[in-house]
């Protein structure tokens, strides 16, 4: 692996130190920004790219049938389309957190297909892995 995402996005006081010692390229558990950025530890640049996450881009809270947050898949699709459109206008990354046991159901797959269909109508979009995104960010920021 070249990156790390903490389970449930929970960090301990030691997480960043451990991730750095492991030599990872990126970390993806923090919500400090909408744009990728370089993590700093104790005032020192780490060379580690943060690919930020956000609750609105996580399928689990939106499809939680045990809580009061369950949404219709087509409504979730529209939320994600709106989130994508603003990210596209701003020229930044759009990254969903998806769980196969959450978004892998038929009606939710239809919503995901609708989102992908919408995304592919926009110019200048590329689908990539977190590794590819982190390498792109490093190159753009002169971190290599």
Say what each PLM segment does.
Residues 26, 74-144:
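C-terminal domain-boundary segment and adjacent tail
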Residues 2-90:
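Active-site-adjacent pocket scaffolds in enzyme catalytic domains
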């Amino acid at each position: 692996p070249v990156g790390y995402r903490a389970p449930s996005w929970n960090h301990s006081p030691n997480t960043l130190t451990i991730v750095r010692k492991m030599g990872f390229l990126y970390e993806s558990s923090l919500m400090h920004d909408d744009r990728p950025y370089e993590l700093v530890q104790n005032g020192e640049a780490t060379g580690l790219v943060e690919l930020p996450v956000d609750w609105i881009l996580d399928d689990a809270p939106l499809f939680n049938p045990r809580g009061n947050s369950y949404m219709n898949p087509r409504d979730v699709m529209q939320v994600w389309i709106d989130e994508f459109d603003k990210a596209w206008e701003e020229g930044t990354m759009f990254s969903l957190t998806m769980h196969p046991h959450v978004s892998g159901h038929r009606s939710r797959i239809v919503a995901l297909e609708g989102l992908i269909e919408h995304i592919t109508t926009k110019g200048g979009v590329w689908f990539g892995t977190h590794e590819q995104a982190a390498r792109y960010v490093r190159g753009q920021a002169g971190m290599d």
